[in-house]
Amino acid sequence: MAPKRRGKKGKAKGNAVVDGVAPEDMSKEQVEEHVARIREELDREREERNYFQLERDKIHTFWEITRRQLEEKKAELRNKDREMEEAEERHQVEIKVYKQKVKHLLYEHQNNLAEVKTEGTVVMKLAQKEHRAQEGALRKDMRVLKVELKEQELANEVVIKNLRLKQAEEITKMRNDFERQVREIEAKYDKKMKMLRDELDLRRKTEIHEVEERKNGQISTLMQRHEEAFTDIKNYYNDITLNNLALINSLKEQMEDMRKKEEYLEREMAEVSLQNKRLAEPLQRAKEEMSEMQKRLGNHERDKQILACTKARLKVTEKELKDLKWEHEILEQRFIKVQQEREELYRKFTAAIQEVQQKTGFKNLVLERKLQALNAAVEKREVQFNEVLAASNLDPTALTLVSRKLEDVLESKNTTIKDLQYELARVCKAHNDLLRTYEAKLLAFGIPLDNVGFKPLETAVIGQTLGQGPAGLVGAPT
């Protein structure tokens, strides 16, 4: 570190005035002190000059060292550039070699694709031929089923016609029975009404005759009693007449008046009594007869109500029969429509199953062929690559780079192969699930599996175990 300066700048430049005193005015001691200070400053300046000179030499030395290092680095950089140019030239040569190899590989790949397409065309033709044969057999089965369906429809029509005739006969028989029962009930109750009316008339006449006889007897008895009373009174008056004629005459007159009044009153009383009796007893009997008639009338009304209810039930039964006929016709139409829909669904379902089975079988075959071709191509490429590596005599660095690239290519190819295997497993699983669903639907519709006309083929990849879950959840094949 450079030493610090002491003193003032004004003193270094000149001592025109030193401590407020001119040099010529200083004393000897002051001049000596001033000289000592100047010497100290001179020594200090020398030390600083030496320090800065050392610093300059050190910096110059560092600069020389740095310049030499820079020249060395530039030389190394030029060497690296030359090495990079040489490596680029070698890389271009390797690229040309690999491009030539890739051309050969593409040519072989195109040849393999042409072979695969040819094989696929042959397989497609065979599948189409088999499909035509199956279609002919299915059409033949459909014709047989249509004939059977027509025969069944004719048999059903005959059965329905017989049922209708039988039903019409039963309805006619029931109507005749109801009409006969109605006529019998009407005749029965008309006869009962006539008998009841005759009986009531006879009873009324008999009771009237009995009342007349009873009233006539009462009138005769009453007249006889009156005659006896009159005879007694007459004898009494005759006895009195013997004693007192005047009294008798007066009594006769009174008696005559009394007799007339009595006769008049008796006649009125007899008439009133007769009228009361004649009215009271017939009224009572009439009330009893009326209650009896009301009871019988109630029975008759109840019978009439039963008859009306029977007629109403007959009408309701006829209406229900008519409704049942209409519902029977509707159900027949719906049955025919459901049968047609069932046949159509069965036909579509069978066609869809056959189409899916053919597609999945063909797709499985194509995928297996692709896998075999890819495996063969990979093995062939490995052999060619080993031959090329053996013949090229590359350095270890380039060989490592090429090996790494080849491993990447092989890894991508293996990934493609695994994806294809997974797709094949998923398609096989979907096909098998579709077969299970198809069998379940056939059993739900009541169609035995033996009547399908063909045996569904379950697909499986050789050497692989497929998952047992749904087709969308197929695990990676093992």
UniProtKB/Swiss-Prot annotation:
Cellular compartment(s): Cytoplasm; Cytoplasm, Cytoskeleton; Cell projection, Cilium, Flagellum; Cytoplasm, Cytoskeleton, Cilium axoneme
Positions of the UniProt region annotated as Disordered: 1-32
Disulfide partners: none
GO molecular function, one term: small GTPase binding
Region called Regulates microtubule-binding, residue ranges: 1-114
Disulfide bond listed as a keyword: no
Alphabetical list of InterPro entries matching this protein: GAS8 (IPR039308), GAS8_dom (IPR025593)
GO biological process, one term: axoneme assembly
Any coiled-coil regions, as ranges: 24-201, 243-427
Alphabetical UniProt keywords: Cell projection, Cilium, Coiled coil, Cytoplasm, Cytoskeleton, Flagellum, Golgi apparatus, Microtubule
UniProt-annotated stretches for the region Interaction with SMO: 357-478
GO CC annotations on file: 9+2 motile cilium; axoneme; ciliary basal body; cilium; cytoplasm; extracellular region; glial cell projection; Golgi apparatus
Main localisation: cytoplasm
UniProt key word Cytoplasm: yes
Basic residues compositional bias, start-end: 1-12
Binding partners and assembly: Component of the nexin-dynein regulatory complex (N-DRC). Interacts with microtubules. Interacts with SMO. Interacts (via coiled-coil domains) with RAB3B (in GTP-bound form). Interacts with DRC1. Interacts with DRC7.
Function: Component of the nexin-dynein regulatory complex (N-DRC), a key regulator of ciliary/flagellar motility which maintains the alignment and integrity of the distal axoneme and regulates microtubule sliding in motile axonemes. Plays an important role in the assembly of the N-DRC linker. Plays dual roles at both the primary (or non-motile) cilia to regulate hedgehog signaling and in motile cilia to coordinate cilia movement. Required for proper motile cilia functioning.
Similarity comment: family membership: Belongs to the DRC4 family.
Protein name from the UniProt record: Dynein regulatory complex subunit 4
Gene: Gas8
